[in-house]
Structures are given as C-alpha cells and as structure tokens.
C-alpha cells in the first residue's frame, strides 16, 4: 500500500531535481526557442508534501514541463519535440549520478544510481504538457506499437484549467490534510485495481476537484 514519504527524506532530492529542471528550461529556450515553465506536481510541491511510496519501495518526484510557446516545427512534429527535450536532459545529467532519460508513454524518467548499491532508490519523471483552447492541460502521449507503428498526440486532462486556484482555496480553508487523505485513498484504490492509467498528476487533479466540489 502507498504511504507518505517524510519531508526530510525528500528535501535533498527535490533540490537536485529543481536544479536540473532549471538548466533544462534555459537550454530549451536558448537553443531551440522553446519557452517553458516547470513545476512539481501537487504531490511534490513545497509545503504540500504528498509524495508517496508503495511499501518500502523507491519513490519519485513528478515534474510538469508546460510549453508556453515554441516554433511551429515542433508543434507539427511532436516526436521531434519529445526527442529534443530528452536529448537536452541527457546533456544536463551526463555529469551527474542520474541516468539518461528513458522514454515512456507519457513521461521521461531519469534514475539516480548509487555507487554502493545497484538498487534504484529514487527517480524523477518529466511530463510534457501544453494548454488547449479551453485552457485545459494536455499531456504529450507516445503510443509506441513498434518502430514502424508509433504516434504522438496531445491527451487532454479534464477539469485541469483552474486546479491550482482550487488547490489554493482548499489550503486557505484548512482542508489540506483532508486532501492528503483523499489523494492517498485514491492512490491505493487504483493500486488495488492494478490500474496503471492514473499517474500521480491525474490522481491529484481528481482529488482536488472532488474535495473542492464537496466543500464549495
């Protein structure tokens, strides 16, 4: 079952990852004219610790890299966009203990390796997002069915356009611990169902919307 990770265990990893993300943001802007903003998903934000681990397993931090603007060449070729982000990340982590970014369906994952242990203890995931005309966030999804049959598309995240405002309202009204409980229950519910289609970011949005609608 999922449980929360204590803040003191998260702090140093968050500092390292934020530094890498700052370098990534700057490199994308300077080399490719890709203007982005990055943020920790609500499950990892400062003073909002909702980072979880399954049992005694490893944990990760989830980052959103939101596209603000970029040349049409990238809008028209989403594979090129994801490859550019991953290649840029690899240049940055090349001199660290983090591995090159591994591509998956919805994120790029970098793993921290320890010299004294081959066991993976920490990783961080980067999801690439952009907003559609409705203001909702859309995640870049890589549907890989083999080298000759793959596609890239934006997948809308429902009810995500004002989730930050709702989360701020919950926190301001002393409801953050209740949100933590809802979020953890949902994480364990999807775990019991063996549902891999609800990453932390989606569960966080579901939890915020559910609790906000309950109280406001």
Predicted regions and their residues:
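Helical scaffold of the NTase/Pol beta-like nucleotidyltransferase catalytic core
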Residues: 1-42
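Amphipathic alpha-helical segments that form well-ordered structural scaffolds
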Residues: 20-23, 84-88, 207
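Conserved catalytic core of two-metal-ion nucleotidyltransferases
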Residues: 28-32, 79-134
